[in-house]
Swiss-Prot record:
Gene Ontology terms: biological process: defense response; defense response to fungus; killing of cells of another organism
Pyrrolidone carboxylic acid: residues carrying this PTM: Q30
GO cellular-component term (any): extracellular region
Keywords on record: Antimicrobial, Disulfide bond, Fungicide, Plant defense, Pyrrolidone carboxylic acid, Secreted, Signal
Top-rank taxon: Eukaryota
Name assigned to this protein: Putative defensin-like protein 15
Signal peptide: 1-29
A Pfam short name: Gamma-thionin
Gene: PDF1.2B
Keyword Transferase assigned: no
Family designation: Belongs to the DEFL family.
Subcellular location: Secreted
Function: Confers broad-spectrum resistance to pathogens.
Disulfide bonds: C33-C80, C44-C65, C50-C74, C54-C76
């Protein structure tokens, strides 16, 4: 039993040691602002198509269909 406890303690210490050397990669987040798409017409039902249109036609970083009263609209996310 003592040998088993020693092995478990060694494994735990090794994991703590490896975790201490793990360097977290921090990328400064770029704040994105919402902007209704200027090129989308009608109700937005396909977020992937909205995303592609925002990126390719409007130079946005991202796009998705969001509910904005009274319907779903294509919203582009651009750097603030």
């Amino acid at each position: 039993m003592a040998k088993f406890a020693s092995i478990i303690t060694f494994i735990y210490a090794a994991l703590v040691l490896f975790a201490a050397f793990e360097v977290p990669t921090m990328v400064e987040a770029q704040k994105l602002c919402e902007k209704p798409s200027g090129t989308w017409s009608g109700v937005c039902g396909n977020s992937n198509a909205c995303k592609n249109q925002c990126i390719n036609l409007e130079g946005a970083k991202h796009g998705s269909c969001n509910y904005v009263f009274p319907a779903h609209k294509c919203i582009c996310y651009v750097p603030c």
